[in-house]
Regions:
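Conserved phosphate/anionic-ligand binding catalytic regions in large, soluble enzymes, centered on
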Residues: 3-22, 41, 65, 120-133, ...
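Hydrophobic alpha-helical positions that pack around
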Residues: 86-209
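Short internal beta-strands
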Residues: 73-80
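Conserved alpha/beta core surface patches that mediate binding of polyanionic ligands
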Residues: 4, 11-28, 48-54, 174-185
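Histidine-anchored nucleotide/phosphate-binding helix
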Residues: 55-68
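Short small-residue beta-strand/loop micro-motif enriched in glycine and branched aliphatics
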Residues: 41-46, 205-208
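Short coil-to-beta-strand
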Residues: 27-36
Length: 209
């Protein structure tokens, strides 16, 4: 993941491999993986469309991340205005379980991972990716908080937690399929891979970023 130069696709652009390395390897208790599909920015629907049209890329990316960090439980935090896509994500989870890609002893290995969506809440614009942890796990208001502690040491239910955006997790299977170096070559220096953009409203021209 570090070789791929994949950065978080939720806005902050933090290096994904570096973030994953913060998860304590020898922690004796439960650890959690959280996907942030709240997507509250106006005119942004990329995460919704990933769940709608390619949910298995997201689920596979979460499972790969969980395997890399030794995590067995994951949640997808989805905001409450895309009810139809809840059902699509649940269907994809059931399909992945039936195919042996989720649940106990995935593909006959010793690795087990379960994923579920967090029950819907009214829509919030989550400016910090650890806000879903605050809203759902600590029963507090969804607002930025002083750090430390960081989610990797004190996150969901007070346990080590890694949080990534939907698009970030959906890119992970492509990193493994292509290899880190080839994936990195698709993007800019220190910012590998491709990026999804939504073009909305009235526009006159597009320019290269």
């Amino acid at each position: 993941m570090k070789t791929s130069s994949l950065r978080g696709r939720g806005g902050a652009g933090f290096p994904t491999g570096l973030k994953w390395s913060f998860m304590p390897r020898q922690f004796p208790g439960q650890k959690y993986l959280v996907c942030n599909t709240d997507e509250g920015e106006p005119g942004t629907f990329k995460d919704r469309d990933i769940i709608r049209y390619n949910p298995h890329a997201l689920i596979e990316g979460m499972a790969i991340g969980a395997y890399a960090m030794g995590i067995t439980v994951g949640y997808n935090y989805i905001h409450g205005e895309i009810w139809a896509d809840y059902d699509r994500f649940e269907e994809a989870i059931d399909e992945a379980r039936a195919a042996g890609m989720l649940g106990d002893r995935i593909l006959g290995t010793d690795f087990s991972f379960s994923a579920a969506r967090i029950p819907w809440l009214r829509r919030l614009h989550l400016r910090r990716r650890d806000c879903p942890v605050g809203v759902t796990g600590r029963q507090k208001k969804g607002q930025p908080r002083f750090k430390p502690p960081f989610p990797a040491s004190f996150g969901l239910y007070g346990k080590p937690t890694t949080i990534n955006n939907t698009e970030t997790f959906a890119a992970v299977p492509f990193v493994l399929n292509m290899g880190g170096e080839k994936y990195a070559a698709l993007g800019k220096p220190n910012n590998g891979g491709t990026k999804i953009f939504f073009d909305v409203g009235r526009r006159c021209q597009a320019r290269q970023l």
